[in-house]
């Protein structure tokens, strides 16, 4: 076993003009006692320890304490043994004294008590199950009402969407009004191009024949800051 320790060096112990880094020392430490897993040493294998000699007073006192302990322990054992025997005799006597009619009456009494307990427990169970059944019915009814309300809202939204599409369908291009739609588109061209001048005026269209005046034209728009 090794023990690592830092060696403390003072300035007086250091030689002049030399520096010492972290000094490290190793110290060998032996076991204080022999480990328990090692066998007996050969030098002590056949050694018989000398028995300590007791004085007559000490031996007499130890014997007195030993006898006192044995006597007390024997008394406790005897008391417990008598208690067990008395309990067995009492139980056996009670059992022997009872007649068959008394045993039948006692058994019937136990049956009646058991039946009363079962009836009380059954009543409590029925009440608990009835309460749970009512709560479950109320929960299901609430869920059904919520589902019905959601279904009505969904139908209302669907009807509004259908009405909106019907209104939009009036402007749809079909086979019947396809030619008229083409003629209308050719007669009214739409140009999304525009231009902006230095004054911030916005001109829609690709070409403009006039310069901007004080009042903007229909195709002219003034940009606000």
UniProtKB/Swiss-Prot annotation:
From the Swiss-Prot or TrEMBL record, state where the protein is found: Mitochondrion
What are the protein's GO molecular function terms? structural constituent of ribosome
Q: What is one cellular component GO term in this UniProt entry?
A: mitochondrial small ribosomal subunit
Q: Please provide an example of a Pfam family that matches this protein in its UniProt record.
A: MRP-S26
The primary location reported for this protein is mitochondrion
Keyword terms, alphabetized: Mitochondrion, Ribonucleoprotein, Ribosomal protein, Transit peptide
Report the superkingdom from the record.
Answer: Eukaryota
Q: Which GO terms describe its biological process?
A: mitochondrial translation
Q: Give the stretches traversing the membrane.
A: none
Assembly, in brief, is: Component of the mitochondrial ribosome small subunit (28S) which comprises a 12S rRNA and about 30 distinct proteins.
Give the family from UniProt. Belongs to the mitochondrion-specific ribosomal protein mS26 family.
From the Swiss-Prot or TrEMBL record, give the protein name: Small ribosomal subunit protein mS26
Tell me the organism.
Answer: Drosophila melanogaster (Fruit fly)
The encoding gene is mRpS26
